[in-house]
């Protein structure tokens, strides 16, 4: 009588229970497959929601309208690891719509999406949000058309400029108004984008809004607390830094 070895016992078991083992292998494979699909699906939904939020608000953690603090001072606070700059030289005279341009960091933060066209790349080019076109009664304007706008510089004298439309943007600036104690028209993000050289107007001054990414470990409430002041009577004064609350609304307190 032959001695039974482990290999022979295993082989005999496989032959006897072949269908059961095949079913077990298929079951394990399907379980792994469905779990992988579920994980990928959840990840895809998360990424899609993140992309929609970025298109609506940008990916920055905070912003500061008309920020006069220097970048060196801001970085020395230890709160930030990236700063983008949005420059406002003027508003559109008839609709009070802010006109401006981004530096590369701000453009990367804001993730502007286009219904048609692209960003301005040279002097004389302009990109306009869809809602701004409606306010200016330029609904029929498309990429390649020319528009003549009266620009009111910040604390300056009106100038008339003609541009070629190179982009029609999805709406975003209205979502970034934030809380502000100021009522000036330029205290908004631009719905009209121009090339930086077009910001060289004869009069007025430039206003700069800043966008921030927080340094590792920094939370929104910590950044807000850094700028909060309490007087002798216990009254609190909040800073001009804006973060996003749980509903993605900008707030400075």
Q: What spans do the regions from the language model cover?
A:
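Short, functional N-terminal and low-complexity linear motifs
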Residues: 10-17, 40-44, 97
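Basic-flanked hydrophobic alpha-helices used for secretion and membrane insertion
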Residues: 43-252
């Amino acid at each position: 009588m032959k001695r039974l070895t482990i290999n022979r016992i295993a082989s005999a078991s496989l032959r006897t229970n072949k269908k059961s083992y095949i079913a077990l292998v298929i079951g394990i494979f399907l379980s792994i497959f469905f779990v992988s699909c579920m994980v990928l699906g959840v990840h895809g939904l998360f990424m899609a929601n993140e992309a929609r939020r970025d298109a609506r608000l940008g990916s920055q953690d905070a912003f500061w309208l008309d920020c006069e603090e220097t970048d060196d001072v801001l970085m020395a606070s230890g709160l930030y690891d990236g700063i983008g700059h949005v420059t406002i030289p003027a508003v559109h005279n008839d609709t009070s719509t802010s006109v401006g341009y981004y530096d590369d960091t701000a453009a990367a933060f804001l993730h502007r999406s286009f219904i048609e066209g692209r960003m301005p790349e040279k002097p004389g080019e302009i990109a306009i949000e869809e809602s701004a076109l409606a306010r200016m009664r330029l609904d029929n304007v498309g990429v390649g058309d020319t528009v003549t706008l009266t620009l009111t510089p910040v604390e300056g004298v009106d100038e008339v400029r003609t541009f070629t439309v190179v982009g029609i943007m999805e709406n975003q600036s209205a979502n970034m108004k934030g809380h502000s104690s100021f009522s000036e028209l330029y205290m908004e993000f631009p719905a009209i984008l121009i090339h930086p050289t077009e910001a060289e107007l004869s009069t007025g001054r430039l206003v700069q809004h800043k966008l921030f990414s927080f340094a590792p470990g920094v939370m929104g409430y910590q950044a807000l607390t850094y700028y909060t002041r309490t007087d002798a009577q216990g009254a609190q004064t909040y800073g001009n830094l804006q973060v996003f609350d749980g509903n993605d609304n900008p707030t400075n307190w």
